[in-house]
């Protein structure tokens, strides 16, 4: 009996691995310059990407899905109906919906490039004492900040249920295309230099990255069954900034 057990276990392991094997995702992303007119390129068209073997498109206009939600489940004062902020948000949301539809029509998966942290200015005004440090910087380590990001992710996929996932960037935060939002990177650093301020960033950023990745996995991969791609160059290694890129993927539960 024992001699037959290993082949059975091997077969079971192979079948289990095949069950959860993921098809490679070949993404195209036109990186528009923040604050400038959008790049006019043939590669903006989803149908053209299929000809080159892409199976996913990442939209990066620096007006991402987290700038196109109202946070109404948190506080209706943040983006009241009829306000200039609401009109802008609704306009961006409509454009995003149309882009997702066009991407799917071409047979591609749709992702949005998303900087962390970017929040409505009004939200930061209301919750400043709970989410900002003494310098006015939004502090990701604070419980309220993390709670707000969970609400943000929930509202994103409620507003855009057909979105396949997010490409998260940590390291730079561009606000030129978001007149009603503000933000900063979650990893504290010396703002006068790309080099990290070790006296301020006591854990090297690893703990904040870990907490953020786990939050994203729970809210996006597990709760929504969507994908996350996590991009960052905000680690300190041998006294220089280095880049990291990983796929959290879709959780199997």
Sequence positions of predicted segments:
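Aromatic-lined carbohydrate-binding surfaces of glycoside hydrolases
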Residues: 22-250
